[in-house]
Design a protein with these regions (language model features):
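Active-site neighborhood of phospho(di)ester-bond hydrolases with catalytic His/Asp-centered motifs
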Residues: 32-36, 57, 142-146, 165-168
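N-terminal, active-site-proximal structural segment of metallo-dependent hydrolase catalytic domains
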Residues: 1-49, 226-227
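His/acidic metal-ligating clusters that form di-metal
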Residues: 100-104, 108-110, 124-147, 155-156
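Active-site-proximal beta-strand elements of phosphoester/diester hydrolases
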Residues: 2-12, 80-82, 99, 107-117
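Structured beta-strand-rich core segments of catalytic domains in phosphoester-bond hydrolases
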Residues: 31, 35-108, 202-205
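Metal-dependent phosphoester-hydrolase catalytic domains
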Residues: 89, 135-139, 149-227
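Active-site metal-binding loops of divalent metal-dependent hydrolases
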Residues: 10, 37, 114-116, 145-147, ...
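Active-site environment of divalent metal-dependent phosphoester hydrolases
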Residues: 12-15, 39-42, 63, 119-122, ...
Length: 227
């Protein structure tokens, strides 16, 4: 089963939900892993523009919630999801992960949308907490989001010891895969990690004018095949 995955920090849709959707629409993602998803209304507008369905705490009446989201395009559907807030996360900007099970025609995939913080020690602790959370998940696992650090930093290294880094295994060899800042990308801080049941067929960063204007992060798109 083929699956196209989008990873994007949309910065609260400050450029507008429709603008963010226009940046990725032609690539028709089956699954989107969104960070800084913003308000309920803006996320709903983004979903409508892309004809996708959400699993997101932003659609629940919770104050100061984790602002990540997992979106799917029919015939994929959200089977269930829950939100895990990382321990010792800041009260006014909580970090965490949305853990969703998505399904289609007998396939089940675990999709984890994560946003790590700005402090290195905190990121490492939360990366360990993330992998503990994923222990025992059956079937394909996709972990995507904004990790706020480079590939050689401790939290990302922790994950690459346990999952495949999709860019390292399928990224454009003529590109560094940098996603931040969008107006002059020099850092690869947005990632998709996949479990061994998933084959990476290709990965690329969208860097045209529309993508650059949609957020301070560029979108990452990855094609995978599920065993």
């Amino acid at each position: 089963m083929d699956l196209r995955v989008l990873v994007h920090n949309v910065k609260g849709f400050k450029a507008g939900p429709e603008q963010a959707a226009a940046a990725v629409a032609e690539h028709v993602p089956d699954l989107a892993m969104i960070t800084e998803a913003g308000t309920r209304r803006r996320l709903e507008r983004y979903c409508r523009a892309l004809e996708m369905e959400p699993a997101a705490p932003s659609l629940l009446p919770l104050a100061r919630s984790v602002r990540n989201a997992v979106l799917v395009r029919p015939p994929w559907r959200v089977v269930r999801f829950h939100v895990h807030r990382f321990h010792a996360s800041r009260r006014f900007y909580p970090r965490g992960v949305v853990v969703a099970v998505i399904g289609r025609a007998g396939y089940r995939v675990h999709a984890l949308a994560v946003h790590l913080g700005l402090a290195g020690e905190e990121r490492r602790r939360h990366a360990e907490e993330l992998t503990d959370l994923a222990v025992g998940l059956q079937g394909p696992v996709l972990v995507g989001g904004d990790f706020n650090e480079s590939a050689r930093s401790p939290a990302v290294q922790w994950l690459t010891e346990r999952y495949w880094d999709s860019w390292a295994h399928g990224g454009d060899r003529d590109s560094a895969g940098s996603t931040f800042p969008s107006n002059d990308p020099t850092s690869r801080i947005d990632y998709l990690f996949v479990s061994e049941q998933v084959r990476v067929d290709g990965a690329w960063v969208l860097a045209d004018e529309t993508a650059r204007a949609s957020s301070d992060h560029l979108p990452l798109v990855v094609d995978v095949t599920l065993d």
